[in-house]
Amino acid sequence: CIYERGNLAMVKMIGRHGHENRIMDLFRQDPDVHFVLCDTYEEVIGGSDLVISAITKVTENFVTDEHFKEGCTVIPICTMGFQNCDLFFDRVFTDEIEQIRGFKYFDHFAPVTTNVADVLNGAAPGRTDNVQRILVYNYGIAIHDLVFAANLLARAETPDTPYRYCRKKHFIRCF
């Protein structure tokens, strides 16, 4: 989870199996990133501006509604643990409505659902105020490929673009 403090990005994590140390090592040289290790999901999610979760197996919601501050954005790579957000978040963004149509609370959040591509193309507004809680069910059907390809192309057009070969595997687990 991430929240801002001035120009600093504060990254809150729960430590599991030493993964948190590898993540901190990746960013140790960046003076604008600070890490906070937490013991509970309430500590991690409470007060965070951005919540990203890639957990694949959970049987209940991580936290109760009051831990999601106004203005936060939640991006669950796997949607488990965040079903309560379906019921009270102000906006839901998705890249493919058909993939979420079968969700338990789809009928509740369908009226506030916006396609991510529509936002990127300017056909629909993104965040319209600083208090909206936004849930992003983005499975990356093709939009990620297009963004990465555009960035790679732009960098390839720049002479002497530095490239550092990855020699280690990094698996980042926030929860």
Segments and roles (model prediction):
Residues 1-4, 154:
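Short, well-ordered alpha-helices that flank and scaffold nucleotide-derived cofactor binding pockets
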Residues 3-29:
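NAD(P)-binding Rossmann-fold cofactor-contacting core
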Residues 8-10, 71, 89, 132:
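A general structural motif
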Residues 10, 34-36, 134:
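Conserved beta-strand segments of alpha/beta enzyme cores
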Residues 18, 81, 140:
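Short, glycine/serine-rich, charged loops/turns that create anion-binding
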Residues 21-56, 155-175:
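Charge-rich, low-complexity terminal tails
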Residues 32-107:
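Rossmann-like adenosine-cofactor binding region
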Residues 85-175:
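Adenosine-phosphate binding glycine-rich loop
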